[in-house]
């Protein structure tokens, strides 16, 4: 599996400018790049349509502007499709991909949009133009499957394994009691298939997100509307703060998902297999300083100083600035 875009689309800071560069490499006979709408700051929100099949897949990334790993993987997937002439996918599926839903947040490297709103808490109110763009696309496209692409912080680990949650998934709930219906079970089966494919490559590093119900979250809303939805959370791979290794694993997961839809291999996976994926938990710091000396009463009785890297935009690059935080 090649990643030809890795040389031109890399790092953590990914904006519309990078999208436009990558779009120039796309085969116009396969991909149709459109403008789905505008952001608060009037930046274009792009969508990429391709495929002619009856099964429709909607994907969006960078709903949170500072979560760019999955965007890189999505661009890798587009490149892979044209480089490998994936007619089996193109004839079976119709795709609508929104690589950056929150271009203002991407440019400012913030989770929220230009109005300071978390778009993943706006699925009921639809108070923001970006939320309306996604909802209009959803209602017009009428997907059979929705893929909600995010990043998670380096602090997340998997269960009691003492390993980072390099990739986590969720089949969102559709009600407060977290019941299982056909819609949600289908998402669970696809997730289980992807998790199984990653087991040998990153053993103990695939997690399951908490499934508490919140109708304001887009995945919960779409599942409530009876569209199977899968949350992807790209996390930390050891010594990979630029998330280039994680990018490859997200890409691989998408390939496995699409192949499993073709072959129906997901059908052998059960609810129990999904539940066996351990939940991710906040278990890590970036650096733990021990055996230090200080006269400060607040610090001297601590076992260690927990250091977290604050991702900070500096001159078009993300720098990781150390901060001490006991929260």
Tell me the role of every PLM-derived stretch.
Residues 1-45:
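Short glycine- and acidic-rich boundary segments immediately preceding or forming the N-terminal edge
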Residues 1-19, 141, 170-178, 182-327:
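C-terminal accessory segments enriched in acidic
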Residues 33, 47, 97, 146, ...:
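Conserved beta-strand scaffold positions in the cores of enzyme catalytic domains, especially
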Residues 46-54:
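Short beta-strand-to-loop junctions in surface cap/lid or active-site-entrance loops
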Residues 49, 108-111, 220-223:
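Short glycine-biased active-site loop of nucleotidyltransferases that positions the nucleotide triphosphate
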Residues 54-56, 68-204:
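Active-site/substrate-binding loop(s) of hydrolase catalytic cores
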Residues 58-61:
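Short hydrophobic beta-strand that contains or immediately precedes a catalytic carboxylate
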